[in-house]
Structures are given as structure tokens and as C-alpha cells.
Amino acid sequence: MTTSNNRIEKLLIEGGGFPAFWYSFGYGKQMLRQITPKFIAGYSAGSLVAVLLLLPDCNTHGIMELFYNTVRCCNLCALEPLIRSTMGECLPTNIHEIANGKLGIILCAANNDRQCKMVINWDSKEELIDCLVASCYIPFLMDGCRTDDKQYRCRDAIFSRNLYEFTKEFDYIIKKEHQNNGIIHFIENIIPVPPGEAVDLVYHGELASAYDCNNVDDTSNSFI
């Protein structure tokens, strides 16, 4: 491996809906077998992956079983109940203590000219889950009428004016490339992928991570 553990300070996991969640989860789990970032941040689906990577015992089988038991109870637009139920079950009661200072959740501050903001401290598990919901908040889709979440008054960072500039502050970025753009890409992101496809995405993420961690260019800030 060409990269030493102490060289990685800040890791960012980008969003991209359900496909990116499974891919990035596989990528991140494999990466942490070789490299230990001091700080992990994420936005949208990437924020969910980021918090799960703080839990060494979190495994693909357990997350998939919980996710697919929950997703059957939710319709296409009920993303918030899915996030709250899944994260409520898999995150420990003291997750806020584990995460404080080690995890960053990136939001789009709708009331501040759509600038990115990053939250790094929480007082409870419930508050952290509220923040995860805000990071995944898509106007009019989450609850049908609001343009931002109720607790943080924010939305998915993909709607931020300065997301690209904000991500430059990170040493490495995990992202899933996509073939389509526009409305097709949006639809692909919000529809849960079948379990078999999720397994494939996790596997491909693991393979990509194993390759990148051994062939990374020292001048690059992306694992893709």
C-alpha cells in the first residue's frame, strides 16, 4: 500500500441515493481495513454511510436485513420514516458521544443563501438522527409540502450553492460514478434497489476500494 494511515485527515462520502449508499458502504468498510481517517463526513446518503462506518461491528448483512425489512413498510415518498427507523435500530444509544468531533454531516442552509454548513456535535442520538434526515432532505418529497426539514431548517447539500468549493477541504472523497444525468439520475437515486443489486454494489465498492487503496496517486484527493 502506498498511503500511510496518518496521512488521511478528512474523508468525505458523497451522496447519490440508494445505489451510492450501498456502493459507498462497501467501499468504506474495505477502506477502513487499511486506512483510518481521523474525521469522516458525508452528505445525503453519504452521511448515513459515514455514521455507520464509525461502528466497527456494523456489517453488510445486518444493515441489509434491517433496511429491507423496513423499506417494505414505506412508500416511495416516505424517505424520512425509512431513515429514522433504520438508523434508530442500528445506531447505539451513545452514538452522539462516539460521533462528536469525528463525524461531520453536511447540510444546505436554506436560510443562509443555500451555503453549505457542517454539524459535528450533537447532544443525543435523536438529535443526530434529525441531522441525518436534514442531510437527506429533498424539498416536497420527504413530507410533501416543506422546502426544508423541521429541526435544522436545512436540506440535502446537493442543493447548496458552494458544495464543490466546500468539498475541496477534504483529503479524500468517495463517490459513485453514474451513467445518467438529470431526471433519470434523480429517479434512479430515490428508488430502492433490489437486494441482489445492493449486494453487487457493495461488492463492487469493496473491489474498487481495495484497488484504489493500493494504487492511489499521492496527488489525488478522490477514491472513485
Stretches with model-predicted labels:
Residues 1-43, 51-224:
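Patatin-like phospholipase
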